[in-house]
Amino acid sequence: MNQGRIWTVVNPGVGLPLLLGSVTVIAILVHYAVLSNTTWFPKYWNGATVAAPAAAPAPAAPAAKK
């Protein structure tokens, strides 16, 4: 472990809950920011279907040669 000596300064009984709690808070804040600043994400989570774009009309067939 690269930073293994941190546990000589901070008790793991305190440090691990602080670390995991801060990760949880950051994840909740990111999800809140995405939900409050986009219109498509809440619809995606609710399962709303997106209306398919209208199909373009087919081009007319060329005139037959005689």
UniProtKB/Swiss-Prot annotation:
Ranges in the topological domain labelled Periplasmic: 36-66
Residues in compartment: Cytoplasmic: 1-11
Assembly and interaction partners: The core complex is formed by different alpha and beta chains, binding bacteriochlorophyll molecules, and arranged most probably in tetrameric structures disposed around the reaction center. The non-pigmented gamma chains may constitute additional components.
Keyword terms of this UniProt record: Antenna complex, Bacteriochlorophyll, Cell inner membrane, Cell membrane, Chlorophyll, Chromophore, Light-harvesting polypeptide, Magnesium, Membrane, Metal-binding, Transmembrane, Transmembrane helix
SUPFAM superfamilies given in the database record: Light-harvesting complex subunits
Transmembrane segments: 12-35
Single GO molecular function: electron transporter, transferring electrons within the cyclic electron transport pathway of photosynthesis activity
Family, per entry: Belongs to the antenna complex alpha subunit family.
Species this protein is from: Rhodopseudomonas palustris (strain ATCC BAA-98 / CGA009)
Protein name: Light-harvesting protein B-800-850 alpha chain B
PROSITE patterns cross-referenced by the UniProt entry: ANTENNA_COMP_ALPHA (PS00968)
A cellular-component GO term for this protein: plasma membrane light-harvesting complex
Main subcellular location: membrane
Annotated membrane topology: Single-pass type II membrane protein
GO biological process: photosynthesis, light reaction
Protein task: Antenna complexes are light-harvesting systems, which transfer the excitation energy to the reaction centers.
Compartments, as annotated in UniProt: Cell inner membrane
The organism's place on the tree of life at top rank: Bacteria
Annotated a bacteriochlorophyll binding sites: H31
